[in-house]
Amino acid sequence: MTVSRDMTTLESNVFSQILSGTCEEPIPAQKIRGRYGMSKRQLENVVESLRVNFRIPIVAKKFNPNGYYIPRNEEERSEGLAPYKRQILTEQKNLSIIQSIDLEDFWNNKKAL
């Protein structure tokens, strides 16, 4: 679903920056944050808005050179999605473990830890 509004100036500026990146030379988050005086959380929110509201397929490299880019083919998309897939698997594992812990048993036996 796309949003029925225009991009904010900040969204447009961030989009322009990321658009100039490539898989080989992604745009570092620090560069974008520094240029527009944004916190890490603000940039993450803008990137999420661009993805969800405007359907821009922004991905990120988590290793050097790290940063944001828009994939130009399926190989680049797969490379950019790999860190997100690993993160989801880790979070699913954490969720499963936390949900499976018997809280009463934990608190009754916490002194044994």
What do these predicted regions represent?
Residues 18-25, 39:
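Short helix-capping/hinge SLiMs at alpha-helix to coil transitions
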Residues 28-35:
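A short acidic, leucine-rich amphipathic alpha-helix
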Residues 78-113:
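Long, low-complexity, charge-rich intrinsically disordered regions
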Residues 51-62:
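A short, conserved structural fragment
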Residues 62-72:
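Minor-groove-contacting beta-hairpin "wing" of winged helix-turn-helix DNA-binding domains
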Residues 38-49:
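Short amphipathic alpha-helical interaction segments
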